[in-house]
């Protein structure tokens, strides 16, 4: 276990350099997340013979990805960044990867922001193309849940979103302190487990939107559990007592919204 506990001392968050540009493992994992989301979703479309063309779904992917990126960055700036007012008064800096003329990349993404960005982009796409919002998001969440695994692995390799202090033998040293590998917990709980449940249940769904809403519910529950092993963001800390974090608060909101929509849509289907 010694190698595992000291794993951060064995590799660099920067995978390689392209001239003056450092390519981080986080960026590589993000690219793999996008590719896996597309591959998994298209595999299910083909395997389950779903009524949607490749061209239409390819177009949807672009809309969804833009929504995810915009939502993730804006969500972080509004709820997590300690310089929120600066970005509000200098919005052009939100996506500026340069600091004083030096490339530093874009740091700070919020998954909850990405979630709502994805919803908005999906709604706008479906409205424009006259496609069922619930049908297409049922497909999308299969890919999203699989891609999430790579996203959290990216956080792990980037040595960010660290866990709380622990004495468990599988903990890892961060700055000389043994902590929970919370990013791995999240990859398993919020990614792998959710994906397996959705993949297993997809043939048993009784209405369009059931998988999408199940994803929101399952993700929120898994995230709330994982938050108890994850160190609160240093700039925010605990919002209430020593248990309520911004992640838990936002997950509770998603949970309430998705449960509400699930109950309403299920009642409509039963009534009809």
Swiss-Prot record:
It comes from the Bacteria. The keyword Membrane applies. It is an enzyme of class 2 (transferase). Its EC number is 2.5.1.145. The chain crosses the membrane at residues 21-41, 60-80, 101-121, 131-151, 181-201, 209-229, 244-264. Belongs to the Lgt family. Disulfide bonds: none annotated. Its main location: membrane. GO terms for molecular function: phosphatidylglycerol-prolipoprotein diacylglyceryl transferase activity. GO terms for cellular component: plasma membrane. InterPro entries: Lgt. It is a multi-pass membrane protein. The lineage of its organism: Bacteria, Pseudomonadati, Campylobacterota, Epsilonproteobacteria, Campylobacterales. Catalyzes the transfer of the diacylglyceryl group from phosphatidylglycerol to the sulfhydryl group of the N-terminal cysteine of a prolipoprotein, the first step in the formation of mature lipoproteins. Keywords: Cell inner membrane, Cell membrane, Membrane, Transferase, Transmembrane, Transmembrane helix. Pathway: Protein modification; lipoprotein biosynthesis (diacylglyceryl transfer). It is found in: Cell inner membrane. This is Phosphatidylglycerol--prolipoprotein diacylglyceryl transferase. GO terms for biological process: lipoprotein biosynthetic process. A 1,2-diacyl-sn-glycero-3-phospho-(1'-sn-glycerol) binds at residue 152.
């Amino acid at each position: 276990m010694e190698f595992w506990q000291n794993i951060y001392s064995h590799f660099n968050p920067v995978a390689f350099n392209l001239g003056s540009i450092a390519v981080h493992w986080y960026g590589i994992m993000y690219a793999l997340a996008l590719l896996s989301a597309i591959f998994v979703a298209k595999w299910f479309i083909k395997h389950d013979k779903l009524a949607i063309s490749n061209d239409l779904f390819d177009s949807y992917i672009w809309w969804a990805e833009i929504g995810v990126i915009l939502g993730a960055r804006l969500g972080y700036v509004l709820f997590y960044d300690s310089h929120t007012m600066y970005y509000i008064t200098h919005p052009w800096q939100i996506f500026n990867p340069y600091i004083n003329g030096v490339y530093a990349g874009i740091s700070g993404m919020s998954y909850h922001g990405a979630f709502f960005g994805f919803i908005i982009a999906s709604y706008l796409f479906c409205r424009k193309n006259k496609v069922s919002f619930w049908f297409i998001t049922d497909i999308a969440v299969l890919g999203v849940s699989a891609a999430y695994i790579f996203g959290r692995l990216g956080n792990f390799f980037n040595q960010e979103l660290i866990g709380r202090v622990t004495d468990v033998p599988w903990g890892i040293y961060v700055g000389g302190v043994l902590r929970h590998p919370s990013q791995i917990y999240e990859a398993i709980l919020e990614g792998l487990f959710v994906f397996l449940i959705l993949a297993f249940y997809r043939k048993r769904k009784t209405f369009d939107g059931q998988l999408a809403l199940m994803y929101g519910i399952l993700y929120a529950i898994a995230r709330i559990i994982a938050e108890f092993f994850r160190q609160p963001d240093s700039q925010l800390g605990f919002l209430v007592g020593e248990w309520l974090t911004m992640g838990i608060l936002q997950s509770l909101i998603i949970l309430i919204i998705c449960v509400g929509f699930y109950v309403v849509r299920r009642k409509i289907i039963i009534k009809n």
